[in-house]
A protein has these predicted regions:
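Membrane-interfacial helix-loop-helix junctions in multi-pass membrane proteins
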Residues: 51-54, 189-245
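Transmembrane helix segments
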Residues: 39-47, 164-211
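Hydrophobic alpha-helical transmembrane segments of membrane proteins
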Residues: 55-82, 151-153, 158
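Aromatic- and glycine-rich beta-strand/loop motifs that create alpha-glucan
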Residues: 1-32
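Alpha-helical transmembrane segments and their short interhelical loops
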Residues: 102-178, 227-251
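Short cytosolic juxtamembrane segments of multi-pass membrane proteins
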Residues: 252-259
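Hydrophobic alpha-helical transmembrane segments of multi-pass membrane transport/permease proteins
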Residues: 21-47, 60-75, 118-119, 180-186, ...
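Transmembrane helix boundary and interhelical loop/hinge segments in multi-pass membrane proteins
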Residues: 19, 75-100
């Protein structure tokens, strides 16, 4: 067990060192959701959005939950990129030939992506606070937001790793990534509530796990525990099922890739 933990720690630090060498990429990844979605998009539609429709004090307050989950989405779907590059340059094959627990490779990636995403979410909530958005559920609510984000992120990272192990080139990977990310964002309650969507889009959005994550986080920010506790148990159950299915698919893809 001690050896297993050391393997996970060493591989996780490898991802950290790689990220620290890519300072521009790290900075862009951090500021992109805040700058584009929260600040530009939020302020652009601040006066256009009807507070009666979004049921929030202002549009930035409404949008914050969406930006949090969009950050989880983008990081999760990109979580397999480094594994794909390791596969393409032969490092993954060499790593698998060593006496290392194979699951430590996967777990280290989950740990890295989850940690980076959680830090980003905290920064986003901090910036939102500067715009007057204060989570109605306090610090405990922030912890629950991180938990929901982590649960959603695990499934997304599993999908990303399954793609990384299955596709033949990074070109195919990024094509699928682009195809998945934008529809998931626009067919969710990230930017507008379900009640304001066309009927067909609202029906599709209900099937989107991103919508469930957003609708669990939004009351934690806007209204407080009374409203937040209602969907929380259902969302946790949905996320557990979502994660289980995604992890099963990722495990099968991993076994095929190294088999």
């Amino acid at each position: 067990m001690q050896e297993y933990r050391q393997e996970i720690a060493a591989l996780t630090m490898r991802w950290v060192r790689r990220l620290s060498r890519e300072k521009f990429s790290m900075l862009f990844t951090l500021i992109q959701p805040m700058l584009f979605w929260l600040i530009f998009f939020g302020n652009l539609f601040q006066r256009a959005a009807d507070v009666q429709v979004v049921q929030a004090p202002n549009y930035i307050s409404f949008l914050t939950a969406g930006v949090v989950v969009m950050t989880v989405l983008n990081n999760g779907l990109a979580g397999g990129v480094d594994l794909l590059f390791d596969k393409e340059n032969g490092f993954l094959e060499r790593l698998m030939s060593t006496p290392i627990h194979r699951t430590s490779v996967i777990l280290s990636r989950f740990l890295f992506v989850t940690t980076v995403t959680s830090l980003q979410v905290l920064v986003i909530l901090g910036v939102a606070f500067l715009f007057g958005v204060q989570p109605a559920t306090g610090f405990l609510g922030v912890a629950v937001i991180l938990l929901i984000g982590m649960m959603f992120g695990v499934g997304l990272t599993a999908i990303s790793m399954a793609m990384a192990f299955s596709v033949k080139s990074h070109g195919d990977f990024f094509s699928v990534l682009g195809f998945l990310s934008l529809p998931m964002i626009f067919l969710s309650s990230a930017l507008v509530p379900l009640s304001a969507m066309p009927k067909l889009m609202a029906m599709l959005a209900v099937l989107n796990p991103m919508t469930w994550a957003i609708d669990a986080i939004r009351p934690l920010i806007l209204t407080g525990w009374t409203e937040a506790l209602r969907p929380l148990a259902i969302v946790v159950l949905i996320m557990l099922v979502f994660d289980a299915l995604c992890l099963y698919g990722s495990a099968k893809a991993f076994r095929r890739a190294i088999g």
